[in-house]
Curated annotation (Swiss-Prot):
<dbReference type="InterPro" id="IPR010919">
    <property type="entry name" value="SAND-like_dom_sf"/>
</dbReference>
<dbReference type="GO" id="GO:1902041">
    <property type="term" value="P:regulation of extrinsic apoptotic signaling pathway via death domain receptors"/>
</dbReference>
<dbReference type="GO" id="GO:0016605">
    <property type="term" value="C:PML body"/>
</dbReference>
<keyword id="KW-0597">Phosphoprotein</keyword>
<feature type="modified residue" description="Phosphoserine">
    <location>
        <position position="190"/>
    </location>
</feature>
<keyword id="KW-0539">Nucleus</keyword>
<keyword id="KW-0805">Transcription regulation</keyword>
<keyword id="KW-0804">Transcription</keyword>
<feature type="region of interest" description="Disordered">
    <location>
        <begin position="136"/>
        <end position="170"/>
    </location>
</feature>
<dbReference type="Pfam" id="PF03172">
    <property type="entry name" value="HSR"/>
</dbReference>
<feature type="domain" description="HSR">
    <location>
        <begin position="6"/>
        <end position="121"/>
    </location>
</feature>
<keyword id="KW-0963">Cytoplasm</keyword>
<feature type="modified residue" description="Phosphoserine">
    <location>
        <position position="319"/>
    </location>
</feature>
<feature type="modified residue" description="Phosphoserine">
    <location>
        <position position="318"/>
    </location>
</feature>
<feature type="region of interest" description="Disordered">
    <location>
        <begin position="357"/>
        <end position="381"/>
    </location>
</feature>
<dbReference type="GO" id="GO:0010596">
    <property type="term" value="P:negative regulation of endothelial cell migration"/>
</dbReference>
<dbReference type="InterPro" id="IPR043563">
    <property type="entry name" value="Sp110/Sp140/Sp140L-like"/>
</dbReference>
């Protein structure tokens, strides 16, 4: 009866531990969503892997890609996918997130994966993400009592004693952890803080071997010892950043350059820090500087490559388009050279300036409008006759002065064939109708009719037609008809 009562209680405890573990992991996953979205710089192969393993639907996959095509930042798209994973969160989600392909494609996920290992001090819950079975790792959290119950068919009393011993060990370990926190806080303020951190790193490296994590305790004392070793030094080595500060500034004078190089020596900084756990445990951090050999002042430093680690990548495509437009505008200006706008002089390049000045200095090379040959004038011409010879283009004739006085609509010009023309018709006959200025088109001995009118040789003809008198016979007939 005791054995039958113990097995349901152990199963409920196992379920409670599993639920507690998943809740802690989910809580830590929520806090790390922004960091994960910032670490994943491209959608491939992250979104494709989620779709292939049916963590997201095909429709949602297409929606995420459409948002990327609409110039939405990649980190916001990844954050939206992580919100979908949060709804279906379990250990398989973490296994898919930190698989080998993603770790190789996104190296920044290594630090985030290590932070999940610090959720529990013993780090046993996170080993399933590295390729093991999550269920087998969860069995380690149950304590040695579960292994005894599975190994012995009728060991109910052993199960109870083992579970009680496991609870007592947890109490001891919690007390030891509080004592270690106070000691670490005191050592962090003491001058020998670096030595203590180096000792903790060595102990942690010795305890973090796969053998110590994979072997199950065979008895209660072995379990207490293993748990104590894992909890006494939970600090782990984390390579945060390696910075190389180069001093490549050349100052005037040898003394200034020497002082500058002595102050700004190259250094490599390695930070040893511990991840923050959900239990509120803050461990000591230490930095060790390894100075390198100072470079001579006359040596040139190679250009350092900087990678933009900004979270917002919305400017990736739009900024590239703007830069291309600026480049094309600059190239176009360089190709066209300097120019004049509204009589505002712009500095010209030497090549353009010499060409422009040389062209302006040589009048023969300038392009200008070609003018036809001038019609010679007769200075001492006689305009006393009744008829004057006139010319308009290819047409030639004689102008009758008396008829010209009557008006412009009178046929006062007689051609060579004997045909009579008005001044406007004679202009059309000489193929100068486009000018529409017969006073300027028709000439007499080289002088235009306008000039002859101004000199008084010809009288300016009236523009109106002369009314012809009515026939008296027709007027009488009209009166009689009335």
């Amino acid at each position: 009866m005791e054995g039958s009562d113990g097995s349901p209680r152990m199963s409920t405890e196992q379920e409670n531990t599993e639920m507690h573990l998943i809740e802690c992991m989910l809580k830590h996953f929520k806090t790390q969503k922004v960091a994960i979205s910032n670490a994943i710089r491209s959608t491939f192969p992250f979104l494709e892997s989620l779709r292939d393993h049916e963590f997201i639907t095909g429709k949602m996959y297409e929606d995420l890609l459409d948002s990327c095509r609409s110039l939405v930042p990649v980190d916001k798209v990844i954050y939206r996918a992580l919100e979908e994973l949060e709804k279906k969160f379990d250990m398989t989600v973490l296994c898919e997130l930190f698989n080998e392909v993603n770790m190789e494609k996104y190296p920044d996920l290594n630090l985030i994966r290590r932070s999940f290992g610090c959720v529990f001090p013993n780090e046993l819950c996170f080993q399933g993400i590295d390729g093991g079975n999550p269920n087998s790792q969860l069995s380690l959290e149950q304590g040695p009592g579960a292994s005894y119950s599975q190994g012995s068919p009728n060991g109910s009393s052993l199960d109870l004693s083992a579970s009680e011993g496991w609870r007592s060990n947890d109490r001891r370990n919690s007390n030891l952890m509080q004592a270690n926190q106070t000691e670490n806080h005191q050592l962090a303020e003491s001058p020998g803080h670096l030595d203590s951190c180096e000792l903790q790193v060595q102990l942690n490296n010795r305890d973090a071997t796969p053998e110590s994590c994979s072997l199950l305790p065979q008895n209660e004392e072995r379990a207490v010892q293993l748990n104590y070793e894992l909890q006494i030094n939970p600090c782990f080595v984390q390579l945060v950043d390696v910075k190389k500060e180069n001093s490549s500034f050349s100052l005037a004078g040898n003394q200034q350059t020497r002082a500058r190089t002595n102050q700004n020596e190259d250094s490599e900084i390695i930070e040893l820090s511990s991840g923050d756990s959900d239990n509120g445990e803050n461990f000591s951090e230490a930095t060790t500087t390894v100075p390198s050999q100072p470079a001579p002042a006359y040596s040139r430093k190679p250009p350092t490559l900087r990678r933009d680690r900004g979270g917002d990548t919305s400017d990736t495509e739009s900024s590239i388009i703007i830069r291309r437009r600026k480049r094309t505008g600059r190239k176009k200006r360089e190709r066209l050279g300097s120019y004049l706008i509204r009589n505002i002089k712009i500095p010209m390049k030497p090549s353009w300036k010499t060409a422009f000045l040389a062209r302006s200095a040589n009048p023969s090379s300038q392009r200008r409008r070609k003018r036809g040959p001038r019609i010679p004038r007769e200075e001492n011409a006689d305009f006393g006759g009744a008829e004057l010879p006139v010319v308009c283009g290819n047409a030639q004739g004689f102008l009758d002065k008396e008829k010209f006085k009557q008006g412009i609509y009178v046929r006062s010009i007689r051609g060579k064939t004997g045909r009579l023309f008005t001044p406007m018709d004679f202009e059309i006959e000489g193929n100068c109708e486009k000018a529409k200025n017969w006073r300027q088109s028709i000439r007499c001995k080289g002088w235009t009719l306008r000039e002859l009118i101004q000199k008084g040789v010809l009288q300016d003809p009236p523009r109106k037609k002369k009314e012809t008198p009515r026939n008296p016979r027709q007027t009488r007939r009209q009166v009689n008809a009335l």
